[in-house]
Design a protein with these regions (language model features):
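SAM-dependent methyltransferase catalytic region
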Residues: 1-117
Length: 117
């Protein structure tokens, strides 16, 4: 069950249709070794599409867990997204990003909702 519309609006939540997520993942991801970030993963529409794309390219579950990171503020939505295999961090994106620029992680691809990402 998705959160009520008013809650989504307050937190900036928008759920991308599966076909759009698949199209963007296919367009953006070029190799099975890309380090990929989804900065506002919600319930995992893009995370699922990213994992599917990487599996089709021959990536293992272990490499997907290592190479794909989703960030989601909402604990319930982060839990839903984590079922698709990649690493999902329950955090504010800006807090997570600060750790990245401090040298913890770099990414080749950023995937997410158009026109927001």
């Amino acid at each position: 069950m998705k959160p009520i519309e008013g809650y989504n609006k307050l937190r900036g939540g928008y759920y991308t249709p599966e076909k759009i997520a698949e199209f963007i993942a296919t367009w953006a991801i070029r190799t099975k070794n890309d380090e990929i970030l989804e900065p506002s993963c919600g319930d995992g529409s893009f995370i699922s599409a990213i994992a599917d794309r990487l599996h089709k390219m021959g990536a293992s579950d272990q490499s997907i867990k290592h190479n794909v990171t989703g960030v989601e503020l909402d604990k319930v939505e982060a839990s839903k997204a984590s079922q698709y295999g990649p690493n999902v961090v329950q955090s504010d994106f800006f807090t997570y990003y600060q750790k990245c620029i401090d040298g913890e992680k770099e990414f080749d691809v950023v995937v997410g909702n158009p026109p927001f990402i």
